[in-house]
Amino acid sequence: MIFSNAVFHWIDADKQEKLIENIAANLKIGGQLICEFGGKGCAESVHASLERGFAKRGLEYPRVFYFPTVGEYAPILEKYGFRVEYAVLFDRPTVQKTENGLEDWIRMFNKKPFEGMDEALVQEIIDETVEELRDQLFVDGKWIVDYVRIRFKVRKFR
C-alpha cells in the first residue's frame, strides 16, 4: 500500500503520468494507492485575486499547482493499471491559525509566482488580495481558505 497526503498537487501536470507510472511499478498486483491532494478549484478565490493583482500591473500570474478533477485524473490512474474503487472531489474549508493567516498562507505555499519580484511589490499585491478577500474568507476572527480536495482509493489490477 502507498499512501499520499497533499503531495500530488505540488508536482507539475506534465510529470503526473511519470509519478503514477513509478507508483504502479512499486506495487504488486492487488496493491493499493490511497491519496488525497488539492482538487479543481482549490484556493480559487486566493489564486483569482492574486491573478487580478498581477494583471493590474501587466504581469502574468503563473498557476503553479496542479488541481485536477476526478475525470481528469482517473484516466491517468487507469492507464497505469489501476482500478478506481473510490474517487471524490469535495470542499474542505481550512482555517488558518493567525489573524495574518491569509498573508502567511500566500507567503508559505505560493512563493513561486513572486520569485524575482521586489519585496515592496510583493507586499502590495498580497495586501490587496487580503483586503479583497476579507469579507469572503475572514470569519469570526479567522481566515478560512477555500480548499477543494480530491481523494482516490485505487487498486493495481495489472
Per-region residue spans from a language model:
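A conserved beta-strand element that flanks and buttresses the S-adenosyl-L-methionine
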Residues: F3
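A short His-aromatic
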Residues: H9-I11, N26
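Conserved class I S-adenosyl-L-methionine
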Residues: Q32-L59
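C-terminal helical/coil "lid" or tail adjacent to the Rossmann-like core of SAM-dependent
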Residues: E85-D140
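Core SAM-dependent methyltransferase catalytic element
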Residues: E103-R107, R149-R158
